[in-house]
Structures are given as C-alpha cells and as structure tokens.
Amino acid sequence: MSFVFNEAEFKKESEEFYSTYPADVSEIENELNQRYEKEKVSAMVQKKWTYEAIAQKCKVKVFRYCPFYSEVITGRDRNSVAGAFPPIPGLGCWALRTHYPVKEFDDWRKPYVERDLLFAEMMTDHSHHYADVERVLYDGFEKIRKEVSEMKAESTEEQEFKDSMLAACDALIALGYKFSEEADRMLQTEKDDSVREQLIRIRDTAGRVPRLPAKTFYEALTSVWFTRELCTAMEGSGFAVMGHYDRILYPYYRKDIEEQRITKEEAQNLIDCMMLITEARWKHNENTSGTNASVVIGGCDREGNIIYNEVTEMILNSFEKYEVSSPKLQVRISSKHPDKYKKHVALIAKLGRNCLSILNDDVLIEAHHRAGKKIEDCRMYLAGGCQEPVLSNECNSRAFMYLNLPLLLDAMLFPKELDFWSKENLRISRVDTAQNFEQFYESVVYNTAQFLAMCAVHYYRFEQIWSEINPMPLYSATMKSCIEKKTEITKGGAVYNSTSFSLIGIGTFIDSLYAIKKTVFEDRKYTLEHLKEMIKADFQGFEADRQYLMNKLPKYGQPDAGVDKLAKQVFHDLAKHSSGMPNPRGGYYEASLFAFYFYDVVKENTWATPDGRHAGQRISRGCNPSETSENIDAATLMNSLRSIDMAEYPGCGVTYLEMPVSQTDTDVTLFEYVLSAFVHCGGSALDFNVVDKDKLIKAKENPDQYRNLVVRVCGYSAPFISLSEELQDEVIQRALRNG
C-alpha cells in the first residue's frame, strides 16, 4: 500500500476542520458536572469519568489526506497541541477546571508577579512532558492493561489509581475501534482511489494499533503519534516531546525495506506528513508562543552507540523542504557524530529553518549523570518545548517559574523600596556594609540562595496540590515504574522526578556585579551610595556615567579575563544554590538557564541596573550576554562558554545565536564551524535565529509577501508576521546589532 503526500489538500482539509474549533461539548461536560455535584469524588475518579465519557460520547475525525489518526473531538482549542494551562476548553481539562484557581498559590505569587521579580503562572509544569510512547510501541495498550489489572491495590487510593489506569487503557483501545469504524463509514461514499487506499489502511490498522505492538514503519509512526496526541487531549496537560524518532523508528523502517513492504520514497512521504501535522493545526495569529511540540533526532542509544541513520536523514529532509515553525527539531549532537550529520544540520540552520535547537550530548549526558542518574538512562534523554531536557523514565517540572536575577540584585541594593524580603521573614545579608567585593558578593550569593530556598519550600506544597487537582493516570500507565510502584506520576511514580526554577537575566546580572566590583571596590570611581542614586534616578542627570558603565567597562561575552573569572563563579554559585532542594515527588531541584520570552515580559518593572541599563529595557536571555553588549559575534559568544561548566545545569543552559546573514550568500561551512565550536567549547543548548535583516524590515512593511518567514524568538519559533510590533522590532534590532 503506497502513500503520496498531497500537502496542499492536507492543509486545506485541516484548515477547514480546525477553523471550527473549539467544538461544543457542553452537554457532556454538564453531565459530568451534575455527577460530580452529587458524588464529590476525588480528582482521580474524575479522570476515570473523563476517559469513559470521551471514549463513549466523543466523535473522531479521520482526514482524507492524512494516513494518521488521532483527532478526538473533546472540545479542546485548536491551539492546544502541547499545552493546557490555564485550563483550556475541552473535556481533558474538566477535572482541573473544577479545582481552579488555587487561592493559596495565587495569593503567594501575586506580589512577586506584579513587580516582575517572578514569572509564575503555574504551580508546576503543565507543558513539557513525555509519555513513554516507546513502551506503547513495543507492548501496546492491551499488554499495559494486563499489567495494570495484575497490580495489587492495598488502599482506596491505590484502587482508584488502578481503576483510572484501566479506564484510560480501555478508552484508547475503544477510540482505536472508533477510528476504524469511521474510516469504514467514509469508504461507503469515497470515490477517489488514492483516498480510498488510505481509508482502507486506517480501517485495517486502527483497531489493532496501538492496542497491540506496532509491526511496520507506518504502524510505528501511528502508534507514537496517537499516544502522544491522546495524552494531550485527555490529560489536561501538555506533552511537548513527540519522541526520539530516528532511534525508535529505524528498526521498523529497516525491516520494511528488507521485506519490500515500503520504499524509501513512501517512507519520506509519511515522515513529511507527520512533520506537518502540528503546523496544519496551529493558528499563529491567535498565539505566537509556538506549539511546544518537538521531535528529537541524533544522540545515542542506552549503550552509547551513535544514532544517525536513514530516518534521521528523512526527518532532516522534511525540515529542509518545508518552512515551518512546528514541530521544533531538537538535534542531539556530540563530538562523535559523523560530519555528514553535522553538515546536514548546518544546512537546515543556513536555510533559516528557525525551529532548530542543538543539544550537546557531551555536556547534557554528563549533567544528568552528575545529578545521580544511571548513565544508560542519561543517554536516553529527550527534550521538548523550548529545549527542556527530560529522561524517558522521568517526570520533570521545568519552565513554570522564572526568577528575574537583575531585579533580585536591585532588591538587595534597595531592600526597603523593593521589599521582597519581609513578606517571608527573610533576614538578608546587607550588601551596603561590605568592605570589599568579596564580602559584597558573598552577601549577594547568600541572599539569592535564601530566596531560592524560600521559593522551593512554597513550591513543595504547590507541587503536592498537583495530584489533588489533576492526576494523570493515562500518562502514568505509559510509565512502567508507576505500575510497579503503585504510584501515580504526579506523586513520584516515575524513576526520576526533577524540578527546576529558570533563572533569567544572568548576563545582565554578571555585568552589574562586575560594574560594582570595578567602579566601587577596585577603582573607587563611585561610592555604592552614589551608584545607587544613579540607579534610582534611572541615570537621569547621569548620562555620562551611564555611558561609562555601558561602554567603557568590559562585559560578559567579551574577551576579558576579569569578567570571565567572575562569570565562571556566578554560573557555579547559581547552579549550586538552585539545585538539591527536595520536591514532594521524591526528587530534587536541578539548575537551568532558559528564558522563553519572559526576559521581555519582566522588563517593565525591572529597575535600572548597575551596568548602565535603563529601567524598562530588556534583560539578557538564557546564557547570553546583555542585549546591549557590543562586538559579540558567534566566535566570541562560543568562546565565552569555555570557562563555564555547563554540566552543572541538567535543566540546560541555552545560548541564543543571531546569524544576520543572507541565506543565499553564506557558505554552509560557517554553520558547521559554529556547531563544532559550540560542542568543543562546552555549550549546553543552542538556538539559531538565522535572519536577513533587510528581509525582516520588508516583512514588517509587507506582511502578506512573507507569510512563511519563520524566526526564533527565544525558545519558541513563530512566523515573523504573527508577532506583535514590539517583538518584531526586537528581532530586527537583534539582527541589526549583530550584523
């Protein structure tokens, strides 16, 4: 059975269908509400009811021009490919909505969020999860159900968990049959032979896969996609990680080729269609922050064998062919990968396919191993969303709380005006009594550690609420350890259970500390009180001093031994004090440095900083230097990573690289050099944003002519014309500054 991907018809069909979303499921939801009002059961039982209602009462959609099936009409938003918080419409979030908002959490976070010290919308991460699709691929839900049925429940809680997992397995099996029946119904009237061929394939497959293990390349793709999509639709959470596709799919492809069941051309068509599903669903002008959906390629297997095969090449071919912002391509790379792989990845970057993240295996595997995880498990890491790493047997909570480091430093300089301390009865170490920079820095580190520890104490309780308002038994069923431990995923059922606070503005933070070190304690150019006076005035009346601070002092990212030494110390101390605190799932905090777009969001209330930055200006992104730093090109940016041990950051530290060059004139060798330098210099994660500054300016003036121009904003990708005018200007300014 062959398949030729008709991109135009698929996109047209998808747009016609998804433009009607969200579907009205109020009748089903009202029935659930009435039942809940009468019985007031636990959230776990609510999820069981949800699965049963979806399986029994929701319709399914089979697309004529797509061979994959997964669309269950649960009432969720069109733009809900990998996120579900705040609770979105649809039955998957019904249980969560009945318990939302959580006053305890909202009351605590409000003063910090209002002043932009924290960006904290969620009690825990609702977007960056990985259901173990590989287990479903090999075992199927029928076998998983059997394992659940053999679980010996010894309490009411365990029995409810068991019953809900059984209901989840039953629901997915029943929905598979529904897709088979719908395809058969459509066959009664379908006249197009090529469409009929795909409907027959769906009819004959959906009742078996993923109920049973996949046997072919097509079935493997279908099983992986179906599982991930149904988890997103039914769990009220986001499953950003689609899977490590080239590693898990290659054995099926090789077997099909050997048995002449498939041609390479048809396999490429199937991959092309799969890579365009999330893009076809998403409507960018409604939400520019991207889908989060991510495909992982490269890397290695459990034994450390390098992954690079024909499926890797086919996935790269798709990204070479199509200008999409989704899914994101998470490229695992190391010093051991072949040059052919690096060259193809470099070509994707050169073409401006700005949905690309590079993950350095040499650093990230070591980072997770240092965190106490088995080396064979560390080798199996994935990533999703922006770049958030997660092991295949791990439930992490990342990218849910962001700490504004520059504003925290200002709060130490102005503890009365920016009082983030008394609310928590924190006794801070006064920085204004320091006799030298060493004492000043010790106070800064102590206060930062106190604040992080305080946040971890509060979030210990907030993470406990997770299981009370939105347990995830379907997700749990895909994790073998949850069944073995008889523990639901949000309570610690995974093998590894990590949490991370995201620290933003580290470049601005380092530059500010260095400015204090140099001008106050070494050169005695200013007293600390005078510097504070300038900061409080936003440098009004002190422009000459601001220019000195901005342009005469070396900055992080520029080649300077003094700044490099301080940067190394700051990175180390922040990693140390944002790691190791316990979470309620039996795991610990891990250090991370990524920004999403919150480096921009928090600027409004971030005071001026000692490096000469004006109040209201953006702070630095990820591991990057300050946005105002000059003369920092790709080479100096890579070199700045040499002195920093990024393996102290299991949650990864992201370097964002603007390459303002014409996509037609630049040799791909430049991008190969950047990739090699990034790995050699010990970077953790790298985001490319390859843009033509002239094209950006033209796109802003004539948006209809540049609908396919995709840019990397910061962790997420989006069509340039979908961005707000302010963000468009910011992307243009980055290109101009680095050009």
Model-derived regions: residue spans:
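A conserved hydrophobic secondary-structure block that centers on an alpha-helix together
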Residues: 187-194
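Extended, non-transmembrane alpha-helical coiled-coils
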Residues: 174, 178-181, 185
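Extended non-globular scaffold/tether segments
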Residues: 163-174
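Conserved catalytic cores of very large enzyme subunits
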Residues: 1-162, 194-201, 205-739
